[in-house]
C-alpha cells in the first residue's frame, strides 16, 4: 500500500496553499487513467477548493452536477482483492487524515441515486502521525493505493476517497474535505458482510475530536489521533 506519509515534514504553522482534487483512478495494472474517466467530476475541478459542510448533500461525492455527472462517468471493472487507487492532481499537501469508503450502487454505479442510504463502509485509512507533540506528514505524495477487500460481494459500487485537511481545523467548519468518487464494477467477489454501515452525509457532525482539532496546540494527555467515522472493514 502507498501511504501519503512517506516523506515527512513537521507542521509548525498553518498552510494556506495546496488545494487539490482526485481526478484519476489507478487501475489494478498500475495504469493511471485520464482525468474524470472513472471518477465523477467534482465541482472544484477548477478551483481545487474543499468541502467544509459535512451536512451538505454535496459532501457525498461533490459532483459537478449530480443528475448528469454520474451518467457521464465510466465504470471501471475490477476484481475483489485487486489493488487500486486514486491520484491527486497535485501533492496531497495539507496535513490530515485520509480514508476510503465504498457503497453498493443501486440501481447502478452511474446512477445519481447510488450511495444515498446507510450503505457506506470504510476499507482503508491513513492516520496522521505525531512526534513530540507535532504532526508529521508527506508533502509530496500524489498517489494512494489500497486493496479492494477479497470477501466483498460482486456488484457495482461507489468508491470514495476523502482527505480531511486539519491545518485550520481548530474551529467548527475549519476542517477541509477533499473528496472523489469512482464508479466500480466488482467481479470475482466473496460472501462477506461489509460494515459498520454509515450514511454520507450523516457520518460526521463536524464536532468529532478528529475533525475539530488544533494540531498546533495538542493537550498534554494527547495519546494519538482519533479517526472519525466507522472502523475499517477487514473483509
From Swiss-Prot:
Effect of substituting residue 93 to A/F/W: Leads to lower C1-oxidation
Compartments, record wording: Secreted
GO cellular component: extracellular region
One Pfam match: AA9
Sugar attachment sites: 29, 221
Predominant localisation class: secreted
Signal peptide residues on this chain, from the entry's feature table: 1-18
EC id: 1.14.99.56
Top-rank taxon, per record: Eukaryota
Summary of the protein's practical applications: Lignocellulose is the most abundant polymeric composite on Earth and is a recalcitrant but promising renewable substrate for industrial biotechnology applications. Together with cellobiose dehydrogenases (CDHs) an enzymatic system capable of oxidative cellulose cleavage is formed, which increases the efficiency of cellulases and put LPMOs at focus of biofuel research.
Mutagenesis or variant effect for residue 46 to A/F/W: Leads to lower C1-oxidation
UniProt keyword terms in alphabetical order: Carbohydrate metabolism, Cellulose degradation, Copper, Disulfide bond, Glycoprotein, Metal-binding, Monooxygenase, Oxidoreductase, Polysaccharide degradation, Secreted, Signal
Catalytic reaction list: [(1->4)-beta-D-glucosyl]n+m + reduced acceptor + O2 = 4-dehydro-beta-D-glucosyl-[(1->4)-beta-D-glucosyl]n-1 + [(1->4)-beta-D-glucosyl]m + acceptor + H2O
Positions bound to O2: 167, 176
Cofactor binding note: Binds 1 copper ion per subunit.
Residue pairs linked by disulfide bridges in the UniProt entry: 61-181
Molecular function via GO: metal ion binding; monooxygenase activity
Similarity comment: family membership: Belongs to the polysaccharide monooxygenase AA9 family.
Summary of the function given for this chain in its UniProt record: Lytic polysaccharide monooxygenase (LPMO) that depolymerizes crystalline and amorphous polysaccharides via the oxidation of scissile alpha- or beta-(1-4)-glycosidic bonds, yielding only C1 oxidation products. Catalysis by LPMOs requires the reduction of the active-site copper from Cu(II) to Cu(I) by a reducing agent and H(2)O(2) or O(2) as a cosubstrate.
PANTHER family: ENDO-BETA-1,4-GLUCANASE D, PUTATIVE (AFU_ORTHOLOGUE AFUA_1G12560)-RELATED
Domain notes: Has a modular structure: an endo-beta-1,4-glucanase catalytic module at the N-terminus, a linker rich in serines and threonines, and a C-terminal carbohydrate-binding module (CBM). The CBM domain is essential for binding to and subsequent oxidative degradation of polysaccharide substrate.
Listed name of the protein: AA9 family lytic polysaccharide monooxygenase D
Organism whose genome encodes this protein: Phanerodontia chrysosporium (White-rot fungus)
